[in-house]
Amino acid sequence: MTLSLHFDKGTIQLHGMAGKYMQHLDGISWDERTNSYRTPAANYRKLVTALCEKNISFQDHARKFSAETFVLKKNIRPRSFQSEAAEAWLSEKHGVVTLPTGAGKTILAVMLIAETGRPTLIHVPTIDLMRQWKEVLSEYFDTPIGLLGGGINDIQTITVATYDSALIHVTHQGNLFGLLVFDECHHLPGEQNQFTALGSIAPFRLGLTATPERADGKEQVLYELCGPLCYEVHIDELSGRTLAPYVVETIEVDMRPEEREQYEISRECYTDFLRKARISFQHPSGWAIFLRRTSESPEGRKAFKAYLLQKKLSQASGAKVDRLWELIQQHKGDRMLVFTQDNEMAYRIGNNFLLPVLTHHTKLPEREAFLKSFRSGEYPILVTSKVLNEGVDVPDANVGMIVSGSGSIREHVQRLGRILRARPGKQAILYELVSKDTGEYFTNQRRRKHRAYEGPVVLPDESGQNSAQIN
Protein backbone atom coordinates (compact mmCIF):
# COMPACT_ATOMS: atom_id res chain seq x y z
CA MET A 1 0.00 0.00 0.00
CA THR A 2 1.51 3.33 -1.11
CA LEU A 3 2.35 5.90 1.54
CA SER A 4 0.01 8.93 1.35
CA LEU A 5 -0.04 12.35 3.01
CA HIS A 6 -3.26 14.07 4.11
CA PHE A 7 -3.90 17.46 5.73
CA ASP A 8 -6.02 17.19 8.87
CA LYS A 9 -6.77 20.08 11.23
CA GLY A 10 -3.33 21.67 11.10
CA THR A 11 -1.41 18.39 10.91
CA ILE A 12 -0.19 15.93 8.28
CA GLN A 13 -1.53 12.38 8.57
CA LEU A 14 0.50 9.56 7.02
CA HIS A 15 -1.51 6.61 5.72
CA GLY A 16 -0.39 3.39 4.15
CA MET A 17 2.96 1.79 4.95
CA ALA A 18 4.07 4.67 7.18
CA GLY A 19 5.45 2.44 9.92
CA LYS A 20 7.93 0.92 7.49
CA TYR A 21 9.61 4.29 6.98
CA MET A 22 9.58 5.74 10.50
CA GLN A 23 13.31 5.24 11.01
CA HIS A 24 13.89 7.60 8.07
CA LEU A 25 11.55 10.39 9.22
CA ASP A 26 11.91 12.86 12.10
CA GLY A 27 9.08 14.53 13.99
CA ILE A 28 6.51 11.79 13.28
CA SER A 29 4.47 10.33 16.15
CA TRP A 30 1.76 7.69 16.50
CA ASP A 31 -1.78 8.99 17.12
CA GLU A 32 -3.76 6.33 18.97
CA ARG A 33 -7.04 8.21 18.44
CA THR A 34 -6.90 7.77 14.66
CA ASN A 35 -4.49 4.83 14.40
CA SER A 36 -2.20 6.80 12.14
CA TYR A 37 1.13 8.57 12.16
CA ARG A 38 0.96 12.34 12.39
CA THR A 39 3.20 15.43 12.35
CA PRO A 40 2.53 19.18 12.60
CA ALA A 41 1.65 20.67 9.22
CA ALA A 42 4.68 22.97 9.46
CA ASN A 43 6.89 19.88 8.98
CA TYR A 44 5.52 19.39 5.45
CA ARG A 45 8.62 20.79 3.73
CA LYS A 46 11.01 18.72 5.84
CA LEU A 47 8.86 15.59 5.43
CA VAL A 48 8.57 15.82 1.64
CA THR A 49 12.28 16.59 1.32
CA ALA A 50 13.16 13.52 3.41
CA LEU A 51 10.84 11.26 1.39
CA CYS A 52 12.34 12.47 -1.89
CA GLU A 53 15.92 12.10 -0.65
CA LYS A 54 15.19 8.52 0.53
CA ASN A 55 13.46 7.69 -2.77
CA ILE A 56 10.31 6.74 -0.86
CA SER A 57 7.27 6.74 -3.13
CA PHE A 58 4.26 8.66 -1.80
CA GLN A 59 1.02 10.31 -2.85
CA ASP A 60 0.55 13.90 -1.75
CA HIS A 61 -3.11 14.59 -0.92
CA ALA A 62 -2.17 17.26 1.61
CA ARG A 63 -1.28 20.09 -0.74
CA LYS A 64 -4.18 21.99 -2.29
CA PHE A 65 -2.19 24.67 -4.10
CA SER A 66 -0.15 24.80 -7.29
CA ALA A 67 2.21 27.19 -9.04
CA GLU A 68 0.82 30.59 -10.04
CA THR A 69 1.99 33.27 -12.45
CA PHE A 70 1.53 36.70 -10.92
CA VAL A 71 1.63 39.58 -13.39
CA LEU A 72 2.92 42.89 -12.04
CA LYS A 73 1.08 45.97 -13.30
CA LYS A 74 4.12 48.21 -12.77
CA ASN A 75 7.86 47.69 -12.65
CA ILE A 76 9.77 47.73 -9.39
CA ARG A 77 13.22 49.29 -9.23
CA PRO A 78 14.56 47.84 -5.98
CA ARG A 79 17.17 49.58 -3.89
CA SER A 80 20.46 47.74 -3.53
CA PHE A 81 19.66 46.41 -0.07
CA GLN A 82 16.25 45.18 -1.24
CA SER A 83 17.95 43.25 -4.05
CA GLU A 84 20.43 41.79 -1.57
CA ALA A 85 17.61 40.81 0.80
CA ALA A 86 15.65 39.19 -2.03
CA GLU A 87 18.70 37.21 -3.15
CA ALA A 88 19.40 36.06 0.41
CA TRP A 89 15.82 34.89 0.98
CA LEU A 90 15.41 33.24 -2.43
CA SER A 91 18.42 30.99 -1.82
CA GLU A 92 16.25 28.85 0.52
CA LYS A 93 12.84 30.54 0.22
CA HIS A 94 12.40 30.73 3.95
CA GLY A 95 13.81 33.04 6.57
CA VAL A 96 13.51 36.38 8.35
CA VAL A 97 14.46 39.73 6.82
CA THR A 98 15.06 42.65 9.18
CA LEU A 99 14.62 46.12 7.66
CA PRO A 100 13.87 49.41 9.43
CA THR A 101 10.42 50.96 9.28
CA GLY A 102 10.14 52.91 6.03
CA ALA A 103 12.79 50.88 4.21
CA GLY A 104 10.33 49.11 1.90
CA LYS A 105 9.47 45.77 3.52
CA THR A 106 6.13 45.66 1.70
CA ILE A 107 7.75 46.24 -1.71
CA LEU A 108 10.29 43.51 -0.93
CA ALA A 109 7.38 41.17 -0.19
CA VAL A 110 5.74 42.08 -3.52
CA MET A 111 8.97 41.14 -5.31
CA LEU A 112 9.24 37.81 -3.51
CA ILE A 113 5.56 36.89 -3.91
CA ALA A 114 5.88 37.43 -7.66
CA GLU A 115 9.15 35.50 -7.84
CA THR A 116 7.92 32.55 -5.73
CA GLY A 117 4.67 32.18 -7.68
CA ARG A 118 2.57 30.41 -5.06
CA PRO A 119 -0.76 31.26 -3.42
CA THR A 120 0.23 33.57 -0.59
CA LEU A 121 -1.19 34.37 2.84
CA ILE A 122 0.14 37.56 4.44
CA HIS A 123 -0.23 37.85 8.22
CA VAL A 124 -0.50 41.28 9.88
CA PRO A 125 -1.25 42.27 13.49
CA THR A 126 -3.96 44.90 12.88
CA ILE A 127 -6.93 45.77 10.66
CA ASP A 128 -5.18 49.02 9.68
CA LEU A 129 -2.19 47.08 8.38
CA MET A 130 -4.45 44.63 6.57
CA ARG A 131 -6.01 47.49 4.62
CA GLN A 132 -2.64 49.13 3.91
CA TRP A 133 -1.24 45.87 2.55
CA LYS A 134 -4.27 45.41 0.29
CA GLU A 135 -3.79 48.91 -1.14
CA VAL A 136 -0.15 48.24 -2.01
CA LEU A 137 -0.77 44.72 -3.36
CA SER A 138 -3.66 45.96 -5.52
CA GLU A 139 -1.36 48.63 -6.92
CA TYR A 140 1.15 46.02 -8.13
CA PHE A 141 -0.71 42.76 -8.82
CA ASP A 142 -3.21 42.17 -11.59
CA THR A 143 -5.19 39.74 -9.45
CA PRO A 144 -7.90 40.14 -6.78
CA ILE A 145 -6.52 40.58 -3.26
CA GLY A 146 -8.44 38.72 -0.58
CA LEU A 147 -8.98 39.75 3.03
CA LEU A 148 -9.42 37.64 6.14
CA GLY A 149 -10.28 39.70 9.20
CA GLY A 150 -12.52 42.47 10.44
CA GLY A 151 -15.61 40.45 9.54
CA ILE A 152 -14.37 39.75 5.99
CA ASN A 153 -13.74 36.19 4.77
CA ASP A 154 -12.62 36.49 1.15
CA ILE A 155 -9.92 33.98 0.20
CA GLN A 156 -7.98 34.70 -3.01
CA THR A 157 -4.64 33.49 -4.39
CA ILE A 158 -3.10 36.44 -2.55
CA THR A 159 -4.83 37.08 0.77
CA VAL A 160 -4.07 39.40 3.68
CA ALA A 161 -5.18 38.22 7.13
CA THR A 162 -4.84 39.40 10.69
CA TYR A 163 -2.96 36.99 12.93
CA ASP A 164 -6.14 36.42 14.92
CA SER A 165 -8.24 35.51 11.87
CA ALA A 166 -5.51 33.34 10.36
CA LEU A 167 -5.38 31.39 13.62
CA ILE A 168 -9.13 30.73 13.52
CA HIS A 169 -9.01 29.40 9.95
CA VAL A 170 -5.65 27.59 9.84
CA THR A 171 -7.09 24.20 10.84
CA HIS A 172 -9.10 24.00 7.61
CA GLN A 173 -7.20 26.39 5.31
CA GLY A 174 -3.64 25.50 6.26
CA ASN A 175 -3.07 23.59 2.99
CA LEU A 176 -4.27 26.31 0.58
CA PHE A 177 -1.13 28.47 0.52
CA GLY A 178 2.43 27.78 -0.56
CA LEU A 179 3.95 31.02 0.77
CA LEU A 180 3.35 32.60 4.16
CA VAL A 181 4.43 36.18 4.78
CA PHE A 182 4.56 37.29 8.41
CA ASP A 183 4.64 41.07 8.73
CA GLU A 184 5.81 42.36 12.12
CA CYS A 185 6.90 38.75 12.61
CA HIS A 186 8.15 39.40 16.15
CA HIS A 187 4.49 38.73 17.04
CA LEU A 188 4.70 35.17 15.71
CA PRO A 189 6.22 33.43 18.78
CA GLY A 190 3.24 34.53 20.89
CA GLU A 191 1.41 31.78 22.73
CA GLN A 192 -1.44 31.73 20.19
CA ASN A 193 0.10 33.27 17.07
CA GLN A 194 2.66 30.51 16.58
CA PHE A 195 -0.12 28.06 15.72
CA THR A 196 -0.78 30.04 12.51
CA ALA A 197 2.64 28.86 11.39
CA LEU A 198 2.55 25.38 12.93
CA GLY A 199 -0.80 24.56 11.33
CA SER A 200 0.16 25.44 7.75
CA ILE A 201 1.96 23.23 5.25
CA ALA A 202 3.37 26.23 3.34
CA PRO A 203 6.95 25.29 2.44
CA PHE A 204 7.98 28.89 1.74
CA ARG A 205 7.99 31.44 4.59
CA LEU A 206 9.04 35.07 4.81
CA GLY A 207 9.28 36.95 8.09
CA LEU A 208 9.48 40.76 8.03
CA THR A 209 10.31 42.96 11.01
CA ALA A 210 12.29 46.00 12.03
CA THR A 211 13.22 44.43 15.36
CA PRO A 212 13.14 40.64 15.85
CA GLU A 213 14.22 40.90 19.50
CA ARG A 214 11.61 39.95 22.10
CA ALA A 215 11.55 40.70 25.82
CA ASP A 216 10.86 37.01 26.54
CA GLY A 217 13.82 35.85 24.45
CA LYS A 218 11.68 33.78 22.07
CA GLU A 219 13.49 34.86 18.90
CA GLN A 220 14.57 31.25 18.43
CA VAL A 221 10.91 30.21 18.20
CA LEU A 222 10.50 32.77 15.42
CA TYR A 223 13.41 31.29 13.48
CA GLU A 224 12.11 27.74 13.98
CA LEU A 225 8.70 28.70 12.58
CA CYS A 226 9.80 31.03 9.81
CA GLY A 227 13.39 30.19 8.99
CA PRO A 228 16.70 31.73 10.07
CA LEU A 229 17.64 35.40 9.96
CA CYS A 230 18.85 35.68 6.37
CA TYR A 231 19.31 39.44 5.90
CA GLU A 232 19.54 42.45 8.20
CA VAL A 233 19.93 46.20 7.80
CA HIS A 234 19.89 48.66 10.70
CA ILE A 235 18.39 52.14 10.93
CA ASP A 236 21.74 53.90 11.19
CA GLU A 237 22.95 52.26 7.97
CA LEU A 238 20.12 53.86 5.95
CA SER A 239 19.96 57.24 7.68
CA GLY A 240 20.24 60.08 5.17
CA ARG A 241 19.72 57.79 2.18
CA THR A 242 16.68 55.54 2.12
CA LEU A 243 15.55 56.94 5.47
CA ALA A 244 15.54 60.54 6.61
CA PRO A 245 18.62 61.65 8.58
CA TYR A 246 17.79 61.78 12.26
CA VAL A 247 18.85 62.94 15.70
CA VAL A 248 17.82 61.40 19.03
CA GLU A 249 17.87 63.82 21.96
CA THR A 250 17.25 62.78 25.55
CA ILE A 251 15.97 65.57 27.79
CA GLU A 252 16.27 65.04 31.54
CA VAL A 253 13.40 66.76 33.31
CA ASP A 254 13.45 67.78 36.98
CA MET A 255 10.24 66.69 38.68
CA ARG A 256 8.20 69.26 40.56
CA PRO A 257 9.12 69.39 44.29
CA GLU A 258 5.83 67.85 45.45
CA GLU A 259 6.15 65.08 42.82
CA ARG A 260 9.75 64.40 43.85
CA GLU A 261 8.75 64.07 47.50
CA GLN A 262 5.97 61.61 46.67
CA TYR A 263 8.30 59.70 44.36
CA GLU A 264 11.04 59.28 46.97
CA ILE A 265 8.60 58.10 49.65
CA SER A 266 6.96 55.58 47.31
CA ARG A 267 10.24 54.31 45.91
CA GLU A 268 11.71 53.82 49.37
CA CYS A 269 8.66 51.76 50.42
CA TYR A 270 8.91 49.64 47.27
CA THR A 271 12.69 49.08 47.35
CA ASP A 272 12.66 48.31 51.10
CA PHE A 273 10.24 45.47 50.39
CA LEU A 274 12.52 44.16 47.62
CA ARG A 275 15.48 44.10 50.01
CA LYS A 276 13.59 42.43 52.85
CA ALA A 277 12.10 39.82 50.51
CA ARG A 278 15.47 39.36 48.76
CA ILE A 279 13.94 39.86 45.34
CA SER A 280 16.16 40.79 42.40
CA PHE A 281 14.81 41.86 39.02
CA GLN A 282 18.09 40.64 37.55
CA HIS A 283 16.73 37.13 38.05
CA PRO A 284 14.66 35.86 35.06
CA SER A 285 11.71 35.19 37.39
CA GLY A 286 12.21 38.32 39.50
CA TRP A 287 9.05 40.08 38.34
CA ALA A 288 6.87 36.99 38.82
CA ILE A 289 8.31 36.48 42.31
CA PHE A 290 7.61 40.13 43.15
CA LEU A 291 3.98 39.83 42.03
CA ARG A 292 3.49 36.67 44.06
CA ARG A 293 5.14 37.99 47.22
CA THR A 294 3.29 41.33 47.15
CA SER A 295 -0.03 39.49 47.08
CA GLU A 296 0.74 37.52 50.22
CA SER A 297 0.61 40.25 52.89
CA PRO A 298 -0.66 43.76 53.64
CA GLU A 299 2.95 44.98 53.58
CA GLY A 300 3.38 43.44 50.14
CA ARG A 301 0.22 45.03 48.78
CA LYS A 302 1.38 48.40 50.13
CA ALA A 303 4.72 47.91 48.39
CA PHE A 304 3.00 47.09 45.10
CA LYS A 305 0.89 50.25 45.29
CA ALA A 306 4.07 52.20 46.03
CA TYR A 307 5.74 50.63 42.99
CA LEU A 308 2.86 51.70 40.74
CA LEU A 309 2.82 55.24 42.16
CA GLN A 310 6.56 55.88 41.80
CA LYS A 311 6.43 54.56 38.24
CA LYS A 312 3.44 56.77 37.39
CA LEU A 313 5.07 59.84 38.92
CA SER A 314 8.25 59.40 36.89
CA GLN A 315 6.45 58.65 33.62
CA ALA A 316 3.69 61.25 33.88
CA SER A 317 5.10 64.14 35.87
CA GLY A 318 3.63 67.59 35.45
CA ALA A 319 7.12 68.86 34.66
CA LYS A 320 7.15 66.64 31.57
CA VAL A 321 3.88 68.14 30.39
CA ASP A 322 5.35 71.62 30.82
CA ARG A 323 8.48 70.67 28.87
CA LEU A 324 6.38 69.05 26.15
CA TRP A 325 4.50 72.30 25.61
CA GLU A 326 7.82 74.14 25.21
CA LEU A 327 8.87 71.64 22.53
CA ILE A 328 5.55 71.96 20.73
CA GLN A 329 6.04 75.73 20.61
CA GLN A 330 9.61 75.24 19.41
CA HIS A 331 8.48 73.03 16.52
CA LYS A 332 5.59 75.03 15.12
CA GLY A 333 5.21 74.12 11.46
CA ASP A 334 6.47 70.55 11.94
CA ARG A 335 4.40 67.35 11.97
CA MET A 336 4.65 65.85 15.43
CA LEU A 337 3.82 62.50 17.00
CA VAL A 338 3.60 62.44 20.79
CA PHE A 339 3.96 58.97 22.37
CA THR A 340 2.96 57.94 25.88
CA GLN A 341 3.08 54.70 27.82
CA ASP A 342 -0.62 54.65 28.68
CA ASN A 343 -3.96 56.05 27.59
CA GLU A 344 -4.42 58.15 30.72
CA MET A 345 -1.37 60.29 29.95
CA ALA A 346 -2.29 60.53 26.27
CA TYR A 347 -5.76 61.87 27.10
CA ARG A 348 -4.30 64.21 29.72
CA ILE A 349 -2.03 65.79 27.12
CA GLY A 350 -4.86 65.92 24.60
CA ASN A 351 -7.15 67.67 27.09
CA ASN A 352 -4.48 70.11 28.25
CA PHE A 353 -3.47 71.22 24.77
CA LEU A 354 -6.63 70.44 22.77
CA LEU A 355 -4.87 67.84 20.60
CA PRO A 356 -6.34 64.77 18.83
CA VAL A 357 -5.62 61.52 20.66
CA LEU A 358 -5.40 58.04 19.12
CA THR A 359 -5.72 55.00 21.38
CA HIS A 360 -7.14 51.51 20.93
CA HIS A 361 -10.44 52.99 22.16
CA THR A 362 -10.68 55.37 19.20
CA LYS A 363 -13.47 54.29 16.85
CA LEU A 364 -12.46 53.49 13.28
CA PRO A 365 -14.20 56.45 11.55
CA GLU A 366 -12.65 58.91 14.01
CA ARG A 367 -9.27 57.20 13.72
CA GLU A 368 -9.30 57.46 9.92
CA ALA A 369 -10.40 61.11 10.13
CA PHE A 370 -7.53 61.94 12.51
CA LEU A 371 -4.93 60.26 10.28
CA LYS A 372 -6.32 61.93 7.15
CA SER A 373 -6.22 65.35 8.83
CA PHE A 374 -2.67 64.70 10.03
CA ARG A 375 -1.51 63.77 6.54
CA SER A 376 -3.16 66.87 5.06
CA GLY A 377 -1.62 69.14 7.68
CA GLU A 378 -4.93 70.19 9.22
CA TYR A 379 -3.79 68.47 12.44
CA PRO A 380 -0.02 69.01 12.82
CA ILE A 381 0.14 66.95 16.03
CA LEU A 382 -1.17 63.52 17.02
CA VAL A 383 -0.98 62.10 20.53
CA THR A 384 -0.98 58.32 20.97
CA SER A 385 -0.17 55.63 23.49
CA LYS A 386 0.81 52.45 21.60
CA VAL A 387 -1.48 52.44 18.54
CA LEU A 388 1.08 54.08 16.24
CA ASN A 389 4.05 51.99 17.42
CA GLU A 390 3.73 49.84 14.32
CA GLY A 391 1.75 49.43 11.17
CA VAL A 392 0.18 52.85 10.59
CA ASP A 393 1.70 54.84 7.73
CA VAL A 394 2.41 58.43 8.81
CA PRO A 395 5.05 59.54 6.28
CA ASP A 396 4.74 63.27 6.97
CA ALA A 397 5.82 63.09 10.63
CA ASN A 398 9.31 64.50 11.23
CA VAL A 399 9.29 65.09 15.00
CA GLY A 400 8.64 62.42 17.61
CA MET A 401 8.26 63.13 21.31
CA ILE A 402 8.36 60.20 23.71
CA VAL A 403 6.82 61.41 26.95
CA SER A 404 6.89 57.92 28.44
CA GLY A 405 7.41 54.35 27.33
CA SER A 406 8.33 50.84 28.37
CA GLY A 407 11.79 49.38 28.70
CA SER A 408 11.37 47.63 25.35
CA ILE A 409 14.09 48.40 22.82
CA ARG A 410 11.75 47.27 20.06
CA GLU A 411 9.08 49.79 21.07
CA HIS A 412 11.51 52.68 20.93
CA VAL A 413 13.06 51.63 17.63
CA GLN A 414 9.53 51.35 16.23
CA ARG A 415 8.67 54.81 17.49
CA LEU A 416 11.83 56.20 15.92
CA GLY A 417 10.85 54.46 12.68
CA ARG A 418 7.52 56.34 12.61
CA ILE A 419 9.32 59.59 11.74
CA LEU A 420 12.00 58.30 9.34
CA ARG A 421 10.16 57.94 6.03
CA ALA A 422 12.25 60.03 3.68
CA ARG A 423 11.24 63.08 1.71
CA PRO A 424 13.44 65.80 0.14
CA GLY A 425 15.03 68.05 2.75
CA LYS A 426 13.55 66.18 5.71
CA GLN A 427 15.47 66.08 9.00
CA ALA A 428 13.88 63.93 11.70
CA ILE A 429 14.32 64.39 15.42
CA LEU A 430 13.18 62.19 18.29
CA TYR A 431 12.93 63.62 21.79
CA GLU A 432 12.85 61.38 24.85
CA LEU A 433 11.61 63.06 28.00
CA VAL A 434 13.07 61.32 31.04
CA SER A 435 12.47 62.20 34.69
CA LYS A 436 15.87 62.94 36.20
CA ASP A 437 17.25 60.65 38.94
CA THR A 438 14.47 58.07 38.68
CA GLY A 439 14.19 54.45 37.61
CA GLU A 440 13.03 55.75 34.23
CA TYR A 441 16.47 57.30 33.69
CA PHE A 442 18.25 53.95 34.08
CA THR A 443 15.72 52.23 31.82
CA ASN A 444 16.51 54.83 29.18
CA GLN A 445 20.24 54.20 29.56
CA ARG A 446 19.73 50.49 28.87
CA ARG A 447 17.67 51.26 25.75
CA ARG A 448 20.32 53.59 24.41
CA LYS A 449 22.76 50.72 24.02
CA HIS A 450 20.91 49.83 20.81
CA ARG A 451 22.89 50.81 17.72
CA ALA A 452 20.04 53.02 16.45
CA TYR A 453 21.15 55.50 19.12
CA GLU A 454 24.85 55.11 18.36
CA GLY A 455 24.87 55.40 14.57
CA PRO A 456 26.31 58.45 12.81
CA VAL A 457 23.91 61.30 12.22
CA VAL A 458 23.71 62.11 8.50
CA LEU A 459 22.65 65.68 7.84
CA PRO A 460 21.59 66.97 4.42
CA ASP A 461 23.62 69.71 2.78
CA GLU A 462 22.07 72.98 1.70
CA SER A 463 20.88 71.49 -1.58
CA GLY A 464 18.94 68.81 0.29
CA GLN A 465 21.21 66.01 -1.04
CA ASN A 466 22.72 63.40 1.24
CA SER A 467 26.17 63.31 2.14
CA ALA A 468 15.76 19.83 -1.31
CA GLN A 469 13.43 20.62 -4.24
CA ILE A 470 9.85 21.54 -3.35
CA ASN A 471 7.65 23.06 -6.06
Enumerate the predicted regions with their spans.
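Walker A/P-loop
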Residues: 91-116
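Conserved segment of the helicase C-terminal RecA-like domain
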Residues: 418-447
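Conserved SF2 helicase motif VI
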Residues: 99, 211-212, 408-429
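Conserved helicase ATPase core of P-loop NTP-dependent helicases/translocases
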Residues: 131, 144-155, 335-339, 344-350, ...
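Conserved helicase/translocase motor-coupling segment
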Residues: 279-367
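Post-DEXD/H (motif II) to motif III coupling segment of the RecA-like Helicase ATP-binding lobe
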Residues: 186-247, 256-261, 265, 272
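A short beta-strand element within the Helicase C-terminal
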Residues: 175-180, 220, 383, 390-406, ...
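Accessory DNA-engaging acidic/polar modules
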Residues: 1-84
